[in-house]
Amino acid sequence: METLTAISRWLAKQHVVTWCVQQEGELWCANAFYLFDAQKVAFYILTEEKTRHAQMSGPQAAVAGTVNGQPKTVALIRGVQFKGEIRRLEGEESERARQAYNRRFPVARMLSAPVWEIRLDEIKFTDNTLGFGKKMIWLRNSGTEQA
């Protein structure tokens, strides 16, 4: 199975991302429900501009993070580590992403928080269900996939 396809299928079944940003040597992490766009290889999240992580991100920033399940046994561990870029969406781009997000999470219709995109540039997917320590790597810029 193609690496990005396997990663995308797994990410589509999850819903919480943890991401971290840094500003002037200070690190901060946050969690949010996400919508995964397999075509753009990006997460869409909602977060208020007044939050510490949004203020540290500004309009655009480097980001790293994880998505993982909570299995009770090592043999079932699956998870993603990533790096990329976070940016606040504006205009039509924001509206399209919000509509898709609201379809996935209808309760979000009541929120006015801005929509942000986390573009994934590097993904490492660990899937112990395929064998202990099995890792798949995807890189945006090189088109490289490693199993």
Swiss-Prot record:
InterPro entries: Split_barrel_FMN-bd (IPR012349), UPF0306 (IPR011194)
Transmembrane regions listed in the UniProt entry: none
Annotated coiled-coil segments of the chain: none
Superkingdom of the source species: Bacteria
The family this protein is said to belong to: Belongs to the UPF0306 family.
Name of the protein: UPF0306 protein YhbP
Organism: Escherichia coli (strain SMS-3-5 / SECEC)
Gene that this sequence comes from: yhbP
